[in-house]
């Protein structure tokens, strides 16, 4: 398809949270809901920040209680909006990637290892387009106290898998040796 979940800077919902500056972090809990975000964080920590904390794979929601002292945590999604109110420091991975590479970032894309019919791709693309054309209605009918969803869905995230995002995705995958 022609769609993804991407950002061209601040993602707002994919962040490393801590009570101390980066260089003082000793341990990092890794969110269990996104392999892409985990791999992005590992790369940024090693290649850009030059920090090598102990990495702990979170297995459930309880890990957020451990984000204190020199223990940090990668938190994604709605939980990241909650965590913003609790943590002293947060580092947005979309922002960091953009600073390092100058490229957008693709957190998720719909892929298939089998050929898809052109009818399916058209229906899929049409369904995505319907959703994008109704963001205002979606936001209005789902109040959310923690963050401005209109801003989130229209400024922080973007959804078209254009050439620049394909380039960014291929670059990220090459860094992972996949």
Protein language model features and the residues they cover:
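Domain-level signature for soluble enzymes in the chorismate/prephenate branch of the shikimate pathway
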Residues: 1-178
């Amino acid at each position: 398809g022609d769609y993804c979940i991407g950002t061209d800077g601040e993602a707002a919902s994919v962040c490393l949270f801590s009570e101390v500056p980066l260089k003082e972090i000793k341990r990092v809990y890794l969110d269990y809901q996104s392999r892409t975000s985990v791999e992005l964080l590992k790369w940024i920590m090693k290649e850009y920040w030059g920090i090598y904390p102990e990495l702990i794979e979170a297995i459930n929601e309880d890990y957020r209680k451990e984000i204190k002292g020199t223990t940090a945590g990668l938190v994604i999604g709605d939980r990241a909006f909650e965590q913003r109110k609790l943590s002293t420091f947060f580092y947005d991975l979309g922002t960091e990637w953009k600073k390092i590479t100058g490229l957008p970032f693709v957190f998720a894309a719909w892929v298939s290892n089998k050929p898809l019919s052109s009818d399916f791709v058209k229906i899929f693309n049409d369904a995505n387009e319907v959703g994008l054309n109704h963001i205002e209605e979606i936001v209005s009918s789902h109040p959310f106290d923690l963050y401005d969803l209109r801003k989130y869905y229209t400024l922080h995230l973007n959804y078209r898998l254009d050439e620049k995002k394909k380039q960014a995705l291929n670059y990220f995958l090459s860094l992972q040796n996949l």
